[in-house]
Regions:
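Enzyme catalytic cores with a strong preference for nitrogen-chemistry domains
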Residues: 1-143
């Protein structure tokens, strides 16, 4: 399996520079300056999720992108998972070490062509029970 870890570029910068990547999975970490408003996405004022889906379709692979949300005063750290042009779901961080973000409610394992992906968002990576739970739920690997 080929995994492309994009560590310095945002999704739009990466896509403009490369036009995509020959990989089974493209992973963008959580950048503090990437914030998505679900309200604006639903109104069509922004297109972050659409861009994630389009990149996954153009590359024929799974794309996982971290981002922050700010909707009606509720701030979360999240990740969106897309495959072949379709959004598979959104995972929110369950943990907040400094209390500056709200926490999500559940963990999810995504069935993809790249395998069963468990998503640990932001500070969740510091809590072994999150990783153990994703493994117990059948993840082939955890991002």
């Amino acid at each position: 399996m080929k995994i492309c870890f994009v560590t310095k570029e945002r999704l739009s910068e990466f896509w403009e520079r490369t036009g995509g990547e020959d990989a089974d999975l493209i992973f963008f970490p959580l950048f503090d300056d990437v914030t998505v408003s679900y309200e604006r996405e639903l109104k069509g004022e922004t297109a972050y999720f659409e861009d994630v889906a389009l990149l996954s379709k153009a590359c024929g692979c799974t794309v996982v992108c971290g981002y922050n949300t700010s909707t009606r005063g509720i701030v979360r750290s999240s990740a969106v998972v897309a495959e072949n042009g379709r959004i598979l779901g959104v995972s929110d961080a369950l943990s907040s070490i400094d209390g500056t973000r709200n926490c999500g409610a559940f963990l999810k394992v995504y069935e993809t062509g790249a395998g069963r992906i468990g998503v640990a968002v932001a500070e969740d990576a510091y809590f072994p029970e999150v990783l153990r739970t994703l493994a117990a739920c059948g993840s082939d690997f955890v991002l």
